[in-house]
């Protein structure tokens, strides 16, 4: 039996181009071979002449051959199938490799920063060039709706030792559905979605979809120029939202109208989108990604997502997306054991599996895997103009013993994942270099040093880090009965001990309103809606006055009563009727907090210790906090009463004498409070709290008041 034919039949051939197509024999003859699965007859028309009938090989009947005694320049196959269906086909095996030597070198070195332009599926020259990295495969084919999903029809060739396989197939176009059919070293067939697919079928279907390069006409040049000009010190108020449940059933195009109007009205500077990358399991909220380069197809195509982002940018709103480079699901048709062996994941399960989530962990030390992830970060920033990446579960990447009893130390015997550290540094440095003004934000729950320090100084290089300590402590405090808060006063003050150790975001995220945790509204210990609303308002005012960027999950901006559930839309009815007056008041306060946050310079000094000064951090008896925020000569005094008792004639020290104008009172009637507004403060030459000037004020229960010094 012909050895090449045998390997083609078993889908184990590394070089099908050496067999298929036209090949000179050295004696003046040329043999042409083609695989046409299911064909009844095949003829080849050479140099425009009469068709030459081809003969099926005895060892492999799907392979047809013809030998002629003249030079072959151009040719096509004329194929007839059962029932008389016929077609004229161009030969895919006439072409030179579609992945060049330089591309292969850069991929092998882990340095190809535009990987999506090389691997995957690309419409070119009247067909599609397919390529995939599968280093352990014995053979790779493309299957799709263009070849009856037959794994023998279109075998790919391996390009040297790069692990890359490729084939250009004529007459395939955008919209075609496909997978890579991989034959493993032990002969098992695996049909896999394309890791580099730029579009995927919505679940439960699992095929990849060919897309043409986008010609979307962006209109956000002004925004991108602004983004590049401002630094991390710019005020940032982030609205975190889940694409599928903000308003159920909305498309990207519909969100481009409704979401933009809503976010503008509330005064947010950014939205953070959950579930942008394609994921099959909706209850995963987008944290078990199967197609890293494909936008979520439930709400529209790639250009529809571009339209949403463009619309937000034109409205002056930045776009952050959740990005999950730490782990990926074990679905058999996706990245896991991609070519039959550990490929994207670490081969040792002590490093390659995440027991908490039942997922695989990327092999950050492998060049091609690191390249896949770094290029993916750039892909979203360049191709979709994403302004920031919120990197999920960073702690699980940094520590080899994260949530593991059985773990493998690094080469120095430590618990630090040194490969992950180097990957994060490279990713951050590359994104910041290639996409001016882009942000990277770490969800990191430990005290790892230098998360937001520059890579040039040995840090990880993130722009910002979620302040998980502030979030946990402040929520623990606020859900206590006011009568007992004085015994836990440190929970509301401790965050200022480390507030300037990193560049922080204060997050009230999706994780805090699910799985029985309740919502901001339901966490409040009060029984009446009046008191609950007052507590939510005072807490939000504390959050907006505290150093750090702001992040609030959808629904918390009005105090949604029920926990978030991704399977349904938000409870917008909370805002309706007379019962919704307190929720409308919280919404009005959120809008005003955002306006003041952006207009009062003192509130924007997030990352410099000189921007904050305690007035009184130790008044646990009365559950009152008071402090100064300052920037460029502008000073703002914040006083918050977390107790259930109105503080009459409460004296606070102030750093300067004069009139302090009230700019916020959460008890104002416009926020559905009682309207106990005392107006401006006039200082007295009486020392208090170590300051020469002071003033006396009334602070209603569960109320925050802000004052600015009149110039």
From Swiss-Prot:
CDD domains: AmyAc_Glg_BE, E_set_GBE_prok_N. One of its GO terms (biological process) is glycogen biosynthetic process. One of its GO terms (cellular component) is cytosol. SMART domains: Aamy (SM00642). The keyword Transferase applies. Keywords: Carbohydrate metabolism, Glycogen biosynthesis, Glycogen metabolism, Glycosyltransferase, Transferase. Its EC number is 2.4.1.18. Pathway: Glycan biosynthesis; glycogen biosynthesis. It catalyses: Transfers a segment of a (1->4)-alpha-D-glucan chain to a primary hydroxy group in a similar glucan chain. The active site is at 392 (nucleophile), 443 (proton donor). The keyword DNA-binding does not apply. One of its GO terms (molecular function) is hydrolase activity, hydrolyzing O-glycosyl compounds. It is an enzyme of class 2 (transferase). Pfam families: Alpha-amylase (PF00128), Alpha-amylase_C (PF02806), CBM_48 (PF02922), GlgB_N (PF22019). HAMAP family: GlgB (MF_00685). PANTHER family: 1,4-ALPHA-GLUCAN-BRANCHING ENZYME. Belongs to the glycosyl hydrolase 13 family. GlgB subfamily. Catalyzes the formation of the alpha-1,6-glucosidic linkages in glycogen by scission of a 1,4-alpha-linked oligosaccharide from growing alpha-1,4-glucan chains and the subsequent attachment of the oligosaccharide to the alpha-1,6 position. Monomer. This is 1,4-alpha-glucan branching enzyme GlgB. It comes from Corynebacterium jeikeium (strain K411).
């Amino acid at each position: 039996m012909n050895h090449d034919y045998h390997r083609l039949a078993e889908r184990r051939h590394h070089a099908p181009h050496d067999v298929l197509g036209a090949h000179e024999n050295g004696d003046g003859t040329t043999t042409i071979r083609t695989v046409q699965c299911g064909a009844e007859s095949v003829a080849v028309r050479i140099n425009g002449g009469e068709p030459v009938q081809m003969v099926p090989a005895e060892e492999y009947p799907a392979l047809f051959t013809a030998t002629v005694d003249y030079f072959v320049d151009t040719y096509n196959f004329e194929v007839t199938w059962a029932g008389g269906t016929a077609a004229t086909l161009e030969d895919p095996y006439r072409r030179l490799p579609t992945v060049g030597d330089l591309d292969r070198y850069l991929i092998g070195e882990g340095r190809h920063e535009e990987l999506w332009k090389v691997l995957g599926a690309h419409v070119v020259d009247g067909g599609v060039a397919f390529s995939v990295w599968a280093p352990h495969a014995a053979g790779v084919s493309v299957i799709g709706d263009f070849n009856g999903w037959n794994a023998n029809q279109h075998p790919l060739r391996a390009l040297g030792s790069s692990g890359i396989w490729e084939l250009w197939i004529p007459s395939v176009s955008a919209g075609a559905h496909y997978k890579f059919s991989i034959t493993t070293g032990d002969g098992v067939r695996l049909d896999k979605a394309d890791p580099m697919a730029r579009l995927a079928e919505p679940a439960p279907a699992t095929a990849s979809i060919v897309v043409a390069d986008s010609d979307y006409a962006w209109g956000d040049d002004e925004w991108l120029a602004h983004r590049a000009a401002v630094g991390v010190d710019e005020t940032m108020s982030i609205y975190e939202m889940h694409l599928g449940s903000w308003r159920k059933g909305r498309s990207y195009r519909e969100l481009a109208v409704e979401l933009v109007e809503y976010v503008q009205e509330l005064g947010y500077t950014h939205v953070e989108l959950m579930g942008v990358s394609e994921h099959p399991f909706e209850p995963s909220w987008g944290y078990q990604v199967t197609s890293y380069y494909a936008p979520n197809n439930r709400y529209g195509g790639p250009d529809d997502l571009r339209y949403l982002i463009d619309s937000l940018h034109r409205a002056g709103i930045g776009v952050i997306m959740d990005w999950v480079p730490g782990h990926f699901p074990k679905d058999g048709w996706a990245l896991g054991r991609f070519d039959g062996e550990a490929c994207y994941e670490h081969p040792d399960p002590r490093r390659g599996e995440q027991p908490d989530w039942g997922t695989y962990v990327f092999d950050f030390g492998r060049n091609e895997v690191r390249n896949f992830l770094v290029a993916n970060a750039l892909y979203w920033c360049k191709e979709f103009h994403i302004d920031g990446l919120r990197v999920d579960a960073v702690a699980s990447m940094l520590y080899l013993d994260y949530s593991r009893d059985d773990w493998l130390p690094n080469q120095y015997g430590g618990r630090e994942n040194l490969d992950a550290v180097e990957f994060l540094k490279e990713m951050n440095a590359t994104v910041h270099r290639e996409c001016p003004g882009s942000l990277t934000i770490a969800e990191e729950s430990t005290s790892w040093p230098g998360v937001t320090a520059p890579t040039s100084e040995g840090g990880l290089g993130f722009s910002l880090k979620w302040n998980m300590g502030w979030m946990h402590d402040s929520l623990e405090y606020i859900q206590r009965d006011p009568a007992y808060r004085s015994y836990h006063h440190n929970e509301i003050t401790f965050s200022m001990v480390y507030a300037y150790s990193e560049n922080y975001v204060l997050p009230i995220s999706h994780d805090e309103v699910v799985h029985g945790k309740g919502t901001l509204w339901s966490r409040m210990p009060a029984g009446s809606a009046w008191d609950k609303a007052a507590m939510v308002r005072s807490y939000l005012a504390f959050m907006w006055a505290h150093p750090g960027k702001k992040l609030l999950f959808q629904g918390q901006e009005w105090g949604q009563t029920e926990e978030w559930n991704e399977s349904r839309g938000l409870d917008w009815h909370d805002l309706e009727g007379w019962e919704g007056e307190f929720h409308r008041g919280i919404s009005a306060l959120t809008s005003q907090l955002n306006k003041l946050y952006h207009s009062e310079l003192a509130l924007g000094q997030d990352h410099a210790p000189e921007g904050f000064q305690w007035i009184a951090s130790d008044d646990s008896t009365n559950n009152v906090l008071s402090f100064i925020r300052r920037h460029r000569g502008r000073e703002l005094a914040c006083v918050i009463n977390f107790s259930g008792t109105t503080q009459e004639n409460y004296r606070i020290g102030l750093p300067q004498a004069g009139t302090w104008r009230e700019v916020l009172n959460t008890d104002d009637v416009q926020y559905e409070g009682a309207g106990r507004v005392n107006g401006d403060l006039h200082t007295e030459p009486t020392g208090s709290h170590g300051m020469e000037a002071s003033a006396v004020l009334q602070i209603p229960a569960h109320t925050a008041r802000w004052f600015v010094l009149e110039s």
